[in-house]
Amino acid sequence: CVLIEVGLARGLDPQDALETLFEAGLEQGWVSDGLIAQSLGQRQEFWSVREHIPEANRLVGSVSSHDISVPISLVPEFITRAGEVIAELGPMLVNCFGHLGDGNLHYNVFPETGKTRSDYLDVRDLVKGGVHDLVDELGGSLSAEHGIGRLKTADLEKYGDPAKLAAMRAIKAALDPIG
């Protein structure tokens, strides 16, 4: 599912622009179905669904959640290949959403229906490693918009550029000499 909102120059019809975009997507095989909001209320309903995804994800409980980015041109490849990585590890569900215009993705892996995240403790690290290895291979980042924090410091050490890490440490030491 992709949610697209357009802003156009005065005098251009957003309905026509979206229909043209949709038709091109159908012809390329990128789109199989779609809706165009017919009112402000319907537009708000579409956005409400998108805005409630993080809350729904928390209620389900993920096997592994990722805030990653990849070059925009490689988003389709990432989604396809990451799905293959997950499928090799067992039956799981993927919820990928984000900001396609800048390559930032929330790539979340969930238990299959009828199971819980505790059923996947033995593969959580494999899921995380598989996703992070692919992000690294594609020249992306393990942290798109939510920062590294304490949970991702080991990942930063593993996948980070040594020169950038040294610069980060120097800045940290200069700003926080006590630690």
Label each PLM-derived region with a short phrase.
Residues 1-179:
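Noncatalytic alpha-helical scaffold of FAD-dependent oxidoreductases
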